Amino acid sequence: MDLYEYQARDLFEKYGVPVLPGIVADTPEEVRAAAEKLGGVNVVKAQVKTGGRGKVGGVKVAKNPDEAEEAAKAILGLDIKGHVVRRVMVSGGARIAREFYFSVLLDRANRSYLSLTSVEGGMEIEQLAVEKPEALARIGVDPIAGVDTTKATEIARAAGFPEELVSKVADVFVKLYDVYKGEDATLVEVNPLVLTEEGEVIALDGKVTLDENAGFRHPEHEELEDKAAADPLEAKAKEADLNYVKLDGQVGIIGNGAGLVMSTLDVVAYAGERHKGVKPANFLDIGGGASAEVMAAGLDVILNDPQVKSVFVNVFGGITACDAVANGIVKALEILGGDANKPLVVRLDGNNVEEGRRILTDANHPLVTLALTMDEGADKAAELAAK
């Protein structure tokens, strides 16, 4: 789960990372009040879960409350890479002498953690990695040993920090790692980490991604989820405990097992090239227990997507036999009734497949078409979606 900047800032403050004062606001009037409370020069920053805000007018400096209110009027409602700004943070200003970069993230390839650090912060890290890879220090972090003062000092020196700053930035690195470890994050990033003209080291902007698989250890993280901004279909699927990701196509996909669903997406995309370029509309993995209720919940989510024109149900019977899946589909269609109004192509294979096909054939539902192979099913679903 990606956090907004203000949420990351609050976590930083919790762990003792030096940050500027900040107040969240939803209206220009609230922004004015926040600027009056903070006093001095402030920065009004769009709260969206994407980068590049400053390049499109999502970050504005305000010298007084009037300017802060006007900045909010310009920023609120702004579309930044598909993210509509509904909230801003009014942050205190800082006189910046230098900008740095620091992050710690999950290194999946090496089954470890990795710190990325540079004395050239402020620019996008992807751009820095391409244009000046030598300016980015990559230091592995042992998940058991973590980042203590000794390790943080090693990181700071490897990145080329001036010796007089090493102890200061090392202290901040330790605290940022504490955020990473303590909150079960997969990414903690500060860009920029700044040195002010007064000699302070401050996290000026922050990005945090939390591991949702560790949510059982952090019930408080549920409060960080922005349900209002979530895709309504994804929110509905989450309530039903379904593994669903919305895409931009026209063929709804239901399968059991992430590998099979991913393969189905590829086959449907390939078939769509022959049928007006239609594409998969979603990823939906119903898992091993394809009960009537689970199937109904999955179909309910997909059929409520106005972009979906057809649905491809692709199931390989294993622990859950194909006859149980077929009964689930029939009962799901009964449960949904008139809400089931788009054609379904069903491909079953594996355990008890013949009985599963017989059940669907005997049901003779007008919306259901049986396919013997995945390729055949994908082609038929793409054809129906293209009509």
From Swiss-Prot:
Gene3D superfamilies: ATP-grasp fold, A domain, ATP-grasp fold, B domain, Succinyl-CoA synthetase domains
Catalytic activity reported: succinate + ATP + CoA = succinyl-CoA + ADP + phosphate; GTP + succinate + CoA = succinyl-CoA + GDP + phosphate
Residues binding ATP, per UniProt: K45, G52, R53, G54, A94, E99
Protein's UniProt name: Succinate--CoA ligase [ADP-forming] subunit beta
Sequence positions that bind substrate: N256, G318, I319, T320
Domain called ATP-grasp: residue spans: 9-236
Record-listed E.C. numbers: 6.2.1.5
Function: Succinyl-CoA synthetase functions in the citric acid cycle (TCA), coupling the hydrolysis of succinyl-CoA to the synthesis of either ATP or GTP and thus represents the only step of substrate-level phosphorylation in the TCA. The beta subunit provides nucleotide specificity of the enzyme and binds the substrate succinate, while the binding sites for coenzyme A and phosphate are found in the alpha subunit.
Pfam families referenced in this protein's UniProt entry, alphabetically: ATP-grasp_2 (PF08442), Ligase_CoA (PF00549)
InterPro entries per UniProt: ATP-grasp, ATP-grasp_succ-CoA_synth-type, ATP_grasp_subdomain_1, Succ-CoA_synthase_bsu_CS, SUCC_ACL_C, Succ_CoA_ligase-like_bsu, Succinyl-CoA_synth-like
Cofactor notes: Binds 1 Mg(2+) ion per subunit.
ATP-binding found in the keyword field: yes
Keyword list, A-Z: ATP-binding, Ligase, Magnesium, Metal-binding, Nucleotide-binding, Tricarboxylic acid cycle
Residue runs in coiled coils: none
Pathway the protein acts in: Carbohydrate metabolism; tricarboxylic acid cycle; succinate from succinyl-CoA (ligase route): step 1/1
Subunit-level organization: Heterotetramer of two alpha and two beta subunits.
Cofactor(s) needed for function: Mg(2+)
Gene transcribed to yield this protein: sucC
Keyword Repeat included in the entry's annotation: no
Binding site for Mg(2+): N191, D205
Biological process annotations from GO: succinyl-CoA metabolic process; tricarboxylic acid cycle
Species of the source: Leifsonia xyli subsp. xyli (strain CTCB07)
Family: Belongs to the succinate/malate CoA ligase beta subunit family.
One example GO MF annotation: succinate-CoA ligase (GDP-forming) activity
PROSITE patterns documented for this protein: ATP_GRASP, SUCCINYL_COA_LIG_3
Enzyme class, first EC level, given as a word: ligase
GO CC aspect terms: cytosol; succinate-CoA ligase complex
Endpoints of the signal sequence: none
